[in-house]
């Protein structure tokens, strides 16, 4: 965690902790009360719009999961979606927006590579290939 603390701004670290706590709270409440189910759905959408969480997830899970597992592919897909969503909130053409788009594109390429390799191993047809 010392390395992680050096890499992340304190505000981002606290933001992640708060997001986790809020997620647990809304999840337990949504089980008990239908009214909170909408709140839980909104929270899920809000979390996907945070690029820093995508990076933390990759740093945390990538060393643990097998390199060519579908979970790693889906992890990269989620990261791509989150980073693209955050880039969409910024003004078009800014340096930060362009940087986020490049990072999202890299995650998308990695996701495609991992998932298409898995499909090839199991003989699943790739519908994107031209016949």
Feature roles, as predicted:
Residues 1-131:
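Extended alpha-helical scaffold/coiled-coil
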């Amino acid at each position: 965690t010392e390395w992680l603390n050096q890499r992340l701004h304190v505000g981002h670290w606290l933001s992640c902790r708060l997001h986790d706590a809020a997620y647990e709270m809304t999840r337990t409440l949504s089980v008990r009360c239908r009214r909170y189910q909408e709140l839980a759905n909104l929270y899920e959408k809000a979390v996907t719009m945070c690029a820093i969480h995508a990076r933390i997830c990759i740093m945390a899970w990538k060393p643990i999961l097998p390199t060519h597992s579908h979970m790693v592919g889906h992890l990269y897909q989620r990261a791509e979606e989150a980073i693209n969503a955050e880039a969409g909130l910024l003004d078009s053409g800014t340096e930060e927006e362009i940087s986020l788009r490049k990072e999202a594109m890299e995650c998308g390429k990695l996701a495609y590579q991992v998932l298409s390799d898995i499909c090839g191993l199991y003989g699943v047809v790739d519908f994107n290939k031209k016949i």
